[in-house]
């Protein structure tokens, strides 16, 4: 047994297109086949004082699945993520996962140590796992994955916001976790940097095959990245939706737009206005 809120949700005016040169051959990457479950929530509740935040959450997520959790501010999605990461405990119910599986978490703020150089910031993710030259080599390897190996000896203050989040992603991934919990990690980035980070995250997820759980307010981001989208409303799962689109995904296609509309309809309590 394993053992927050951000900006107000707003509907995007128009989903951004991928930058020139980022499109690739269409590949089908379906949800993982029925198989081993990475973690399960069973009737999980969480209250703070007399205020219920999660109400009877039942959820199974398979190994290698990319799950997006979306909902309005205060709905309980970040609390769910903190319970998964072991940073909080449920009031009632159980969370089951293999105790040998590492879980790491990435936040909206990079939370880098200003007194440590970039490589040492990444090595923090290896505390209790590796140290010395072995830790440095692993840190340099994952920095290479995120495109920042040449900045390993620099200080955090010289990096842009997007580069700092790349370092935070490297720190979360350096120990090769089986589960990566992402709490609105791209929310503070500008639109182009955000798309670049989405592409980077998807590429590394497909390579390392970890289970990803992304909390986001961005419906377009959820459809672009996830195998499956769960909408939380007032502490309950209101929608559990498979995203059966080929990767890489193209914003603005009719299929992409229909999925966005389905999620938005649930979030805003509307009937189906698409005519589909």
Swiss-Prot record:
**How would you classify this enzyme at the top EC level?**
translocase
Annotated membrane-spanning segments are none
Indicate how the chain sits in the lipid bilayer.
Answer: Peripheral membrane protein
Q: What are the boundaries of the region Disordered?
A: 1-21
The UniProt entry's GO CC annotations, sorted and at most eight, read: plasma membrane
Q: Where in the cell is it found?
A: Cell inner membrane
GO MF annotations, alphabetized: ATP binding; ATP hydrolysis activity
Instruction: List, for all copies, the residue spans of the domain called ABC transporter.
Output: 39-259
InterPro entries, sorted: AAA+_ATPase, ABC_transporter-like_ATP-bd, ABC_transporter-like_CS, ABC_transporter_ATP-bind, P-loop_NTPase
Q: Which SMART domains match?
A: AAA (SM00382)
One Pfam entry name: ABC_tran
Spell out the SUPFAM superfamilies in the cross-references.
P-loop containing nucleoside triphosphate hydrolases
Residues the entry annotates as binding ATP: 71-78
Q: Which PANTHER family match?
A: ALIPHATIC SULFONATES IMPORT ATP-BINDING PROTEIN SSUB, TAURINE IMPORT ATP-BINDING PROTEIN-RELATED
Q: How does it assemble?
A: The complex is composed of two ATP-binding proteins (SsuB), two transmembrane proteins (SsuC) and a solute-binding protein (SsuA).
Q: Which family does it belong to?
A: Belongs to the ABC transporter superfamily. Aliphatic sulfonates importer (TC 3.A.1.17.2) family.
Described function: Part of the ABC transporter complex SsuABC involved in aliphatic sulfonates import. Responsible for energy coupling to the transport system.
Q: What is this protein called?
A: Aliphatic sulfonates import ATP-binding protein SsuB 1
The record lists the organism as Agrobacterium fabrum (strain C58 / ATCC 33970)
